[in-house]
Curated annotation (Swiss-Prot):
Catalytic activity of the protein: UDP-N-acetyl-alpha-D-muramoyl-L-alanine + D-glutamate + ATP = UDP-N-acetyl-alpha-D-muramoyl-L-alanyl-D-glutamate + ADP + phosphate + H(+)
Presence of keyword Ligase: yes
Highest taxon of the lineage: Bacteria
Molecular function via GO: ATP binding; UDP-N-acetylmuramoylalanine-D-glutamate ligase activity
UniProt-recorded name of the protein: UDP-N-acetylmuramoylalanine--D-glutamate ligase
Enzyme Commission number, as recorded: 6.3.2.9
InterPro entries: Mur-like_cat_sf (IPR036565), Mur_ligase_C (IPR004101), Mur_ligase_C_dom_sf (IPR036615), Mur_ligase_cen (IPR013221), MurD (IPR005762)
Keyword Nucleotide-binding: yes
Entry keywords, A to Z: ATP-binding, Cell cycle, Cell division, Cell shape, Cell wall biogenesis/degradation, Cytoplasm, Ligase, Nucleotide-binding, Peptidoglycan synthesis
Biological source species: Caulobacter vibrioides (strain NA1000 / CB15N)
Classification via HAMAP family: MurD
Amino acid sequence: MIPVRGFEDKTVAVFGLGRTGLTAARALIAGGAKVALWDEKPASREAAAAEGFAVVDLQAADWSQFAALMLSPGVPLSHPKPHWTVEKARAAGVEVLGDVELFARTVNAAPAHKRPKIIAITGTNGKSTTTALIGHLCASAGRDTRVGGNIGLGVLGLEDMHGGAVYVLELSSYQLDLTSSLKPDAVVLLNISPDHLDRHGGMDGYIAAKRRIFLNQGKGDTAIIGVDDAWCQQICTEITAANRRTIWPISAGKAMGRGVYALQGVLYDATGERVVEVADILRARSLPGRHNWQNAAAAYAAARAIGISMQDAVDGLMTFPGLAHRMETVGKIGKVRFVNDSKATNADAARQAMSSYPKFYWIAGGVAKAGGIDDLKDLFPRIAKAYLIGEAAEPFSWTLAGKAECVLSGTLEKAVQQAYADAAASGEEAIVLLSPACASFDQFSDFEARGEAFRAAVNGLTAGGGKAAVA
């Protein structure tokens, strides 16, 4: 745990008692603060009280006693409308912040020789894979590495800092909205496509949240920016004009005079005086697909930005074990392979997996994002058949009508059974792909639970009396 500095003998209100809120409360107390916790769920309040926390009804509280409101990132800050705790805090002149901001202030308050290196990663898609990959590169190069934020442990739950440590942090747009003091040594912005627009009031608000990650960078820091979409290209152009830091563009499809890029799966380093061919990403078994070329370029650049050697960075790419729920093979029965890409919670993320296979039996659906699957129409000819689940099943069937055969499966378990039956009947080598292009909250607690349900459904299938074998 990282004890939070700057709130000694002050009281901080904490709203939202999930993993982030409880971890922040513990870290605040460890740093000498007092806390007043609240959640709208009685079970969460009871669990906090059982742990010994002061549970205070923030609706009835005197807000003048609070030095700050620590808001969990899932709670609306501004859109569709500010949460009532935010309105009360603002009315009382109480600042609203998140756990990443508490971490940033604690780092900034530490003596220079005790401050760790910080690599911060954001983007619409690929954040978790890239964060885990950077963590692996740093750790395999011998650095004392801690990985967290929007992946794994909340940032304040990581081991306490020292000058030789490297913190690799995945940051969502929600977290960035609540952060103003973070100064990363290296920032990675992978890509931007429409997502979470209801929480940011539209595309401009979403982009503004992502841009906050660069807010405090200056001389000696590095900005690593994907330039394969127009929004990130514009950000790269604007930040380059500011000329305050080192900027390395990254691309998964075009050669550049400066930066790191991949062409046909080969990684090139153009950060020095000449372009160097450094790795064949196609040899990295846990980085399949063109989208992972960008992830590899970003991770390599981030590792190099904090002084890891070219060879150590390349070695790390080749030994990366991969992440669950990201194009993860969970089993094979006969000629049918089952791929879990449950992390694909929007159409752009699903595109990455769908583009990797010439033909597949597609399981999709859940809570659709803006635009649904309209942007995937160019990939519909690859769909052998679609099996639709959750709230989006019927709308998705309308989009697919006349373009790809589909069935309303309803549940994930039924979809797996139907997809396996059809794939096995084809007699060919086949892929059953769970890449939902949707959030999971209509039927599951999160994408991980959805992915585990897919794994369980696959394991529940039999072929000649045997369970699915992990390929």
